[in-house]
């Protein structure tokens, strides 16, 4: 197939006419396609229909801590929910916060708070001359949209089948105090479906960033959403690895 740049004007006009005809044909079909990403199908939604039958007007709606769950609840979530999520992601319930209805919502709020109030008493990012983030590419565009929204300088880091290029990550974060974070989808990273290796996770946990308020944004969105029934990828739990490496808050 001849590249467009090598075609004559007549050939390009002919191609344009053919594509317009195809476009009109598609329009004529009256298709109404929902191309939303990550939106469950009706069959997937049906899996949770049993939840609709669990409660009725006679149900005791107080949790084990005595909190009336019909009300606003508590800031970090009820104990039962924290324990359930802790078991799913292999993290102690004390380290779980039940918050928001999506990880993207939570990450946006964390970045926003870092800009307005800083992280753990450190300088708010809006007072800094420059804020930078490492962005493994290809990666998730909605992550990048957050940093773009806040005017953060984004630095590309190439992806490998084992995860981001850790030689480059280690070099960049150790040399530049303006680098405040990195976006990560550690399991089945879009679009290649790569899962971070054990070595990659341990190297993340052992990072020595120049910025004391550097944070790893570990968006393990596909923790229980495997691509196939078999095999299923397993990754090391980052928080415990960070604690082992002496970086419990990173």
Question: Where are the language model's segments positioned?
Answer:
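Glycine-centered flexible beta-alpha turn that most often forms the glycine-rich phosphate-binding loop
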Residues: 219
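N-terminal "arm"/small-domain region of PLP-dependent enzymes with the aminotransferase-like
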Residues: 2-77, 86-87
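Conserved core of the PLP fold type I
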Residues: 67-212, 223-246
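A generic secondary-structure signal marking the coil-to-beta-strand transition
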Residues: 29-33, 178, 249-250
